């Protein structure tokens, strides 16, 4: 069995600023859809998948403002549900596996949602059917 052995004798002290992580950032950003109030999120890694999700939310009608590096303001008070049926939405959402994370907040706030079968990064076992099964157990139906 592998282990880390820490040999010290000195008290640890200091400050550590954690680096933003993509998968957590995608989930936290999607949570802005759970309120119509302004949400400010900091420590967001400005990497391709995160920027794609922010662009997708903008298309949905979420007002997004970059306040400074790694800090954004979101306001989801007017969701454009017509956009969810456009080719632009379909292609953007399908190219981002994390787009599945918009579905829960849309169902919770509006009682409906739409996402194409996501593509994107497929490293490891990350099944999407667990999301759908959970939604069905909460009363959602899928077409």
What are these regions (language model features)?
Residues 1-143:
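Structural preference for solvent-exposed beta-strand-turn elements
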């Amino acid at each position: 069995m592998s282990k880390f052995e820490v040999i010290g004798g000195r008290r640890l002290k200091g400050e550590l600023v954690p680096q933003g992580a993509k998968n957590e950032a995608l989930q936290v950003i999607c949570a802005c859809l759970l309120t119509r109030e302004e949400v400010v999120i900091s420590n967001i890694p400005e990497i391709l998948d995160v920027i794609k999700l922010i662009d997708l939310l903008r298309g949905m009608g979420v007002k997004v403002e970059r306040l400074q590096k790694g800090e954004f303001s979101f306001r989801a008070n007017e969701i454009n549900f017509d956009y969810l049926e456009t080719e632009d939405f379909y292609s953007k959402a399908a190219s981002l596996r994390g787009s599945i994370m918009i579905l829960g907040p849309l169902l919770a706030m509006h009682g409906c949602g739409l996402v194409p079968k996501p593509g994107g990064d497929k490293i490891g076992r990350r099944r999407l059917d667990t999301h759908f099964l959970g939604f069905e157990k909460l009363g959602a139906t899928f077409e």
